[in-house]
From Swiss-Prot:
One of its GO terms (cellular component) is extracellular region. It comes from Neosartorya fischeri (strain ATCC 1020 / DSM 3700 / CBS 544.65 / FGSC A1164 / JCM 1740 / NRRL 181 / WB 181) (Aspergillus fischerianus). This is Probable alpha-glucuronidase A. It is found in: Secreted. Keywords: Carbohydrate metabolism, Glycoprotein, Glycosidase, Hydrolase, Polysaccharide degradation, Secreted, Signal, Xylan degradation. Gene3D superfamilies: Alpha-glucuronidase, C-terminal domain, Chitobiase/beta-hexosaminidase domain 2-like, Glycosidases.
Amino acid sequence: MWSGIPVFALLSSIGIAAAENGLDGWLRYASVPCNGNCQRALPSHIVTLNSTKSSQVYVAGQELQDGLHQILGKHASVKSTGCSTDSSIVVGTVEAYRQVCNTGSQAPELDVDGFWLSIRGKSVQIVGQTERGALYGAYEYLSMLAQGNFSQVSYATSPHAPIRWVNQWDNMDGSIERGYGGPSIFFKDGVIPQDLSRVKQYARLLASVRINGIVVNNVNANASLLMPSNMDGLARIADVFRPYGIRVGISLNFASPSTLGNLSTYDPFDSSVIAWWGNVTDQLYARIPDMAGYLVKANSEGQPGPTTYNRTLADGANMFARALKPHGGVVMFRAFVYDHHISEDNWYNDRANAAVDFFKPLDGKFDDNVVVQIKYGPIDFQVREPASPLFANLYKTNTAIELQVTQEYLGQQSHLVYLPPLWQTILRFDLRVDQKPSPVRDIISGQRFDRPLGGWAAVVNVGTNTTWLGSHLAMSNLYAYGRLAWEPTLDSEDIVQDWIRLTFGLDRRVLDTLTQMSMESWPAYENYSGNLGIQTLTDILYTHYGPNPASQDGNGWGQWTRADHLSIGMDRTVKNGTKFSGQYPAEVAAMYENIETTPDNLMLWFHHVNYTQRLHSGKTVIQHFYDAHYDGAETAQTFVSRWESLRERIDAERYQHVLARLIYQAGHSIVWRDAINNFYRNLSGIADEKERVGYHPWRVEAEDMQLDGYVPYAVSPFETASNFTAIVTASNGTTGTASATLDFKTGTYDLGINYYDMYGGKSHWTVYLNDRVVGQWQGNSEDVLSHTPSIYLDGHSATRITFRDVKIHKGDRLKIVGEPDGVEPAPLDYAVVLPRGIVD
């Protein structure tokens, strides 16, 4: 039970704290208003039933002492003897509590890592089935206090599943694949650095949401991690995590016996290979006795694996499992295995089929300490996918779900997208195995098929940025992941409200505003990126960030839309298509097989239809595209004003940081909207019924302006420029000027400039009206925003700056002067003159 309901009403306005950089995350423990009564009602002593400084119970005592002082100014002493319940917090394991406190009935039975929390006046008992559970209970108690909740409670809670891990895709050189929060906190220049202070801070955050394992390196692993010096470094990392109840694991490169061990083979049946892995594993456990185990990506996207030697994936997984077995370790074996060279010319080819095709025949052949780690959908972390059918096809195999906190396809932390509502569409989905209730959450816990292991993994990818993920608001997803991994039936809105109170305080307006924005953010992003199950429509061949729908097709990666001038969507039916729908149990298969019973939000995932196909909503497919993209972009515009309403209620540093990203998102959502709508308007030849697509009366196209030092440039992909054309300076040493006489009636407008901010240069622009400077800016988004930059004029680099409340007279002369820098030729797309209340 997590409780965030305060005893007293949330204040309507609370004084702003000093500037904060986000490093403390939701553990900032800001002072809670208190008239002194709550302090007097709190315990004065903390009794930790273990005095060993490396123990989680000892750490729990330190966390309680520090938290009480920060939240309420309460100075509580800590001791490790006795069991007085008079004005004391007693924290320890069930075993220690029963022995020291001489009680056998008060603490209930708990599952592994579960805890019991009892608050009765000044007497608080926090009792864990393990030391880890006791630490979790301490964080729970502090979370209540930090949210102004001084309720008396008594309850026990245990985890949904034993495996609650995070994955980091950190590389040995310090870079992070799909990381948007700065360089690695674990690696630099091929080694583990001496300063691991950020690792300790990360450990606190993870433990506070009950994460119990971490894989610290990229699944596309570098064998050099297994060198003795780096094993020593891993041991130092493990030493930092251990007091917080988090076990360290590593990703392995399957070919390491060859690339690092100088063997002629990495065949999992070869005795020398088996011995090599056994020796490596023994060396690791000699340094890290509680190592969690291994994560393996094999035979996928160019990674080596057992099929090279005609061995099965189970053969490969079991080789590692047997090396780990004596030490109690686990193999997390990724189900992300597919051929990325298949031909779209074959109507029946389908990447979505791959996981079941590879793994279903192996059900029951994996050792009992192997867990198959399955992405939530059949493709790759898309904005909406059906639940992977593999969850329903492994009766005799341990499974875990793989989620992604890092927003690889979902805005890369430069767009606000609160992910739990997306995750819940998968976790709650009932696969109806054998016509029995089979929600995904019950399969991964091991409950549905009576499996001993199972659980959760999330790709997180924090970095050295003080916001951890590159955005303050993105931290809600990491917090929520931990909460759901413990109890997946929790409500997404309740979770984000707890996070808001812990992160931004108890102000009611802040709570209500951020709750609404968060809950609207995923539907908005889905609307302006890709809808009806068509996938995210991002550029899958480059950054995975901005729009490029054509990149989905015509290649072997298998994220196809099969869009042509008449029709769109993948036919995944058994009757006419790839037979993917038949991978589901009968009841679900029947629903997806028939267009009449397929939900609109997955229509194009399962069916290839004409653009004029009517949806259940009554709209045609193409009109739904047009409307959804306008709706989503319009919602994103409102995020800015809603956040601005909180200006006096949030510290200036975090306020400005978030505001810059929301302003950017508002502009980039229009780039998305126009790119997707223009692409499909051009492809289908079908006009928007509401006459919005391609009609922009408030714009002044840059190529139509009077140019001096600027020249027109045909942008590719074409749809990422208004009217398909931008302007660039004639050379990288030439200043460009674009001028136009404005023919809008006199009034006050918002003046927007759409431009391209490319990697490799920091151009400078100045905007004039009749030689009066309206504003100026530099193209430095690579220093400000978190997303992967682009060296091209495209949907990744396209962005907008807006100058508000500009007084414009009809006939005024608009002039934009661009000064190129580096490889960036001060590119411009258009200017837009917007009356108040108009979304271009």
